[in-house]
Amino acid sequence: MTIDTLHQLRQWEPPYRPDAIIEEGILLPNTVMMLFGAAGSWKTMNSIHLAFCLAKGEPWFGFKTTQATVFTHQVELPKLIIKDRVSKYSNGSRAASQNLFFETPEDDLHLDTTFGLQQLTKDIEEVKRRATNPALPVVVILDPLYLYLAGHISDEYEVKKFQQNVNQLRKKHNITFIIIHHSRLRRVDSSGQVVDLGAEEIMGSSYWNNWLDTIVRVQLVNPFTGNDTVHVSFDKTRNSQTFLPGFKVKWHRENLVPEIIERDIIAEDEPSVRDLT
């Protein structure tokens, strides 16, 4: 630990590239972003699309990105399903990158345990050794969160242990994390109206909301007419200096490629001119 004067602090340089990984403060190096939503809201496909965008340094739904080495760690779906989805998306979008790494471990990996931390550390070290460009930032995608905990997802001790271990990895290996997670069950008030608490709809302890730098929410908007369109919103952007409006995305089932079909217009603000890509 070092104690800096004002001059020393202003002269300090981080041990990693300081470029924003996703612009507008959405994802900065050494931070944690969560993408959450209910079952069937295309979260995993969103994470695959995001992984390809970062690995290629191409825009993610119109937001510029910095090229990164991306390690997608999927513990819910069988390897064959991930292979089929990734292949279909890659063919449909004509996208490929040597900066992408995937793992679907056969055994459970719990990051609220010492053994789980050690195992993921080994995996990250292997990815860094095999990276085509060691200068690129490393982004680790964990999907889904609840399977990375041996304890209960609402238990304060277990949640803090998970967060401490992830923080240790961030600091020691200069890692940026993206975590895929579920929303809690929908609640209604006495009049039958749905109660929506924004980022507080994350399943589990409020310690998640407090810890995360960015929270991206995906909500299915056409469950009875195609089940293929979601609304994406930024429920928390700790490091953004501007308000980020949401947008609607249609997922094309024939190739698993997404398309922005509408952007939210904020009253009293100028409409966004960001490309619909």
Q: What would you call each of these model-derived segments?
A:
Residues M1-R94:
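The Walker A/P-loop phosphate-binding site
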Residues P15-Y16, L28, T113, L117, ...:
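A conditional alpha-helix N-cap/helix-loop micro-motif detector
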Residues D19-I22, G57-W60, K122, E126, ...:
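A generic local structural motif
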Residues N30, A68, P134-L136, H173, ...:
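Structured loop/turn residues at beta-strand edges in well-structured enzyme cores
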Residues M34-L35, G40, M45, F71-H73, ...:
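Phosphate-binding/switch region of NTP-binding enzymes
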Residues L54, E58, V86, S90-S93, ...:
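Conserved NTP-handling cores and scaffolds of large molecular machines
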Residues T65-K161, Q168, W251-E254, D264-A267, ...:
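Conserved inter-motif catalytic segment of the P-loop NTP-binding fold
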